């Protein structure tokens, strides 16, 4: 809750609101191997983009806007270049378009619903799971690792991924994933990446 509150407060100071858009992101607490490290963050930024290169993803048939339940991030974003489309899917869980947890207590069904939600976001970007270059999967309970890893091995045998033991945002969520991908395309309006 502290990370969510702090992120919301900082974003307002930077004019990041539901009216101006947020960033695609995943904010999950964890623990660094060094107990002196209290915060760590990875970022990706590109200078010189035109606003028409950036597109936000919603998948309203599956997901609701995040600000409706008090958090501030975009569900996903894609950026078009002259030679490719990059897609960034924020941490996505087993949720419906009313903001409710779907399939509480069932790791298999939550994983399937989460994939359905991610697929809806990718489809909106004109992409599929085949366009993904990497996935990060967050598990609330390490006991679910064997089941979930088996599901991923079967469905995504060639996609690089890492599993992280971390407290997923809501207590009812057992799993969450974020991912990034690239799709080849030709767009003469923009410079190549």
PLM feature spans:
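N-terminal presequence-like segments and the immediate start of the first folded domain
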Residues: 1-134, 138-193
